[in-house]
Design a protein with these regions (language model features):
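Short, conserved turn/kink motifs that form compact alpha/beta structural patches or helix kinks used as
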Residues: 43-122, 127-133, 138-147
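Active-site-proximal polar cores
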Residues: 1-68, 75
Length: 147
């Protein structure tokens, strides 16, 4: 069945509508989180490994809990190296909100203290007040959305 000729698919006004609906959904059904960006204190110049970092800023942001694995279940595993917590959380954050409220402050950091100001980075921290838990960002979905 062909697309309806009464809608302009991909027009800027419809893209704006979809973005506004995403922001409203996050505001209504999301949770407040604290985003703690990592500042690099010391970097090994040979293999470019970050050897020391600090977290001295925090930004309040709304996020939607897309998938929660490990909450409410005994997911701590005793290994030969100690206790390993396997709690995971998948958060959905609006790119527009991040660009409006966090990116301008991240651009004020010196270039040697940050990795990227446009998106969150692996190694940054998320504080979830719902569970009083601190999570490290392990993966960022950097693909451009369809709209």
């Amino acid at each position: 069945m062909p697309l309806s000729p009464f809608f302009l698919h991909g027009s800027p006004s419809e893209q704006r509508l979809v973005q506004d609906l995403v922001n409203e959904h996050l505001t209504l059904f999301g949770q407040d989180i604290l985003y703690l960006p990592r500042k690099i204190v010391n970097r090994n110049t040979v293999i470019r490994e970050i050897t020391a970092s600090k977290f001295d800023d925090s930004f309040r942001l709304e996020a939607y809990l897309g998938n929660v694995d490990g909450f409410g279940t005994p997911s701590d595993v005793l290994t030969k190296f100690g206790v390993r917590a396997q709690d995971e959380v998948t958060l959905v954050v609006s790119k527009e909100r991040y660009d409006d409220f966090i990116s301008p402050f991240m651009k004020l950091f010196p270039a040697e203290e940050r990795l990227n100001a446009q998106t969150p980075n692996e190694g940054d921290l998320i504080y979830l007040p719902l569970d009083n838990a601190l999570f490290e960002i392990k993966y960022i979905e950097r693909k451009v959305p369809f709209y």
